[in-house]
Amino acid sequence: MPKTAKNKRNNAASGPYDKKSKGSGSTNIFKFDKDYGQHILKNPGISDAIVEKAFLKPTDVVVEVGPGTGNITVRALERAKKVIAIELDPRMGAEVTKRVQGTPLAKKLEVILGDVIKLPQIPPCDALISNTPYQISSPLIFKMLSMPQPPRVAVLMFQREFAKRLVAKPGDSLYSRLTVNVNFWATCTHIMKVGKANFKPPPKVESDVVRIEPYLGSARPNIAFEEFDGLLRIAFNRKNKTLRAAFSIKEVLALCEKNYKVYCTLHNIPLDESVLSDPSLTADMDVDMDANSDTDNDNDGDAMEEDDDDMPTFFKEVKEAEAAKEAAKTPSKNPKSKVALIVRAKINKVLTKTGLANKRARQCDQNDFLKLLLAFHEEGIHFS
């Protein structure tokens, strides 16, 4: 005689990604993939609010990243001229297509299957909306902000701690390279908190919705995104170190030397040896500084900037080369080249001129970093 199936107490599941029971209803069409960060927003009120806060116009083209089963998509289609849904999971792509199949909304929907981060660029659009897969939160923002013509508005759902970083202030523990970039290129507003119970399956963390409005036209800073971000990567590599220490790391010096030589070559400019005649700029050049040379011990509990886990390839290559040299021979103090001496003197000049030498990245706002970048440019030092 077959055994009677036992039900778990209070219909509890052993985990958020367990397979659904056969009789669980038509909405459980497949198992959600946690590798894709699939947490479907099931609260219609929040879906309405996300679309409402985008202030869509009938002429707008909307890009939605990760449409899932289409709960937000349908609402955007009702208001906009077109929605381009970018979906990594083919099953979800088929589901959102089926959602509007046979309706007038179908001709307004375009589905692109693929990873939005690996696309050459985000399709041109007026608005960007997303219940963002948390693992692509930072790359998605940087990709949007670096667009030549970014959307008018983006309404995005993020993990709560990540959202707090977007609106952090100088001195806050969550203040980061991400914070400075977003607030330099856009205005960011917190919209609402979203609890775990509003998703299926529920994530392990709470979420927040934010609205990002990039500066457009003449309001957009006349600075290359990669250039500003390159400076921030150096400053926030260790955000609790002084900027003087950050720019004394040997990998940073090597990068600045390389870029300075390229700049002089491209513009047919001779090396600026005049800075070497100023004793105040060359007094400490005999000290071979590196990441551990900063004597201020204000660590605040973090060693590396938590947002900058993707160290630039150039830094990695330099570190690997240095490690190979150390393994091959006993370290020795080689005499510095003239370019190296010039670049160190120029860095000292910039930090002294701007008055930022002894400030830490976590204490500086976007205007401080802009002042720093422009001063470096005056000395022929670039970061991209």
UniProtKB/Swiss-Prot annotation:
RNA-binding among keywords: yes
Positions that bind S-adenosyl-L-methionine: 39, 41, 66, 87, 115, 131
Enzyme class: transferase
Subcellular location, principal: cytoplasm
Catalysis: reaction(s): adenosine(1779)/adenosine(1780) in 18S rRNA + 4 S-adenosyl-L-methionine = N(6)-dimethyladenosine(1779)/N(6)-dimethyladenosine(1780) in 18S rRNA + 4 S-adenosyl-L-homocysteine + 4 H(+)
GO MF annotation: an example: 18S rRNA (adenine(1779)-N(6)/adenine(1780)-N(6))-dimethyltransferase activity
Protein name: Dimethyladenosine transferase
Native organism: Chaetomium thermophilum (strain DSM 1495 / CBS 144.50 / IMI 039719) (Thermochaetoides thermophila)
